[in-house]
């Protein structure tokens, strides 16, 4: 019991430091320490402790992300997911929002599909989003633990126009998702990164949440991951994500 208590206190301390760093736009500094390492389970416990701190500060969970699923990000990171991250109300932005680079650390974006959860825990609708990231790994080698402990390097999401929120058009229809930066196509991929489509991402997430006594609620948004990559953005860039 004492050992567990001590470990629990240590993870709580790391959680406070992680949240402080994140808010200072200097995320994950503890991973720069070569002596520092976490296993995947402890990384999720850390993520959930940071979430509790954010909830105590008045933020709300609006859903989760399933990350590191597609060939693009797997290749970029050199690691195999999936992993789970947590989404917050303070970081959901409207279509057409202007961002300030100073509010991020190496801002990069993904275009991907999101799932809105129905009252029965199934899929209410699906629509494209832009996911924002602080694209930084500090460990000598990229690890799933660092990715999870930094909340899947998520830094927010940009939602589409309201008319998409109830759309089921692309639930079973095949199409591609395109990412444009300054009217140049930088990447495109099939809508869903896992062979089983949106249901596969959702089932994996439900299983993961269940392991940590968490669950999806009606209205939650789930980012299903992307088969494309992560794209760095510069000052003045205009980003568009669309389905064709």
Where are these regions (language model features)?
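Catalytic-core "active-site belt" of small-molecule-metabolizing enzymes
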Residues: 4-197, 202, 211, 238
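Short basic/hydrophobic patches in alpha-helices and adjacent helix-turn junctions
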Residues: 204-214, 221
């Amino acid at each position: 019991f004492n050992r567990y208590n001590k470990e629990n206190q240590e993870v709580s301390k790391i959680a406070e430091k992680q949240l402080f760093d994140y808010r200072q736009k200097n995320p994950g500094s503890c991973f720069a320490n070569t002596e520092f390492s976490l296993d995947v389970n402890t990384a999720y416990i850390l993520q959930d402790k940071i979430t509790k701190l954010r909830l105590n500060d008045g933020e709300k969970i609006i859903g989760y992300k399933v990350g590191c699923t597609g060939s693009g990000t797997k290749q970029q990171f050199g690691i195999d997911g999936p992993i789970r991250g947590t989404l917050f109300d303070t970081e959901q932005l409207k279509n057409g929002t202007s961002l300030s680079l100073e509010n991020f650390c190496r801002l990069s974006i993904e275009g991907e599909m999101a799932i809105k959860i129905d009252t029965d825990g199934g899929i209410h609708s699906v629509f494209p989003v832009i996911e924002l990231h602080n694209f930084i790994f500090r460990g000598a080698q990229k690890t799933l633990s660092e990715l999870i402990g930094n909340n899947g390097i998520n830094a927010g999401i940009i939602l589409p126009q309201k008319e998409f929120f109830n759309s089921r058009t692309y639930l079973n229809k095949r199409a591609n998702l395109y990412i444009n930066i300054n009217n140049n196509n930088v990447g495109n991929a099939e809508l869903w990164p896992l062979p089983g489509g949106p249901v596969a991402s959702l089932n994996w997430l439900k299983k993961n949440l269940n392991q940590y006594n968490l669950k999806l609620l009606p209205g939650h948004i789930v980012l299903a991951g992307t088969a494309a990559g992560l794209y760095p953005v510069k000052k003045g860039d205009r980003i568009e994500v669309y389905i064709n």
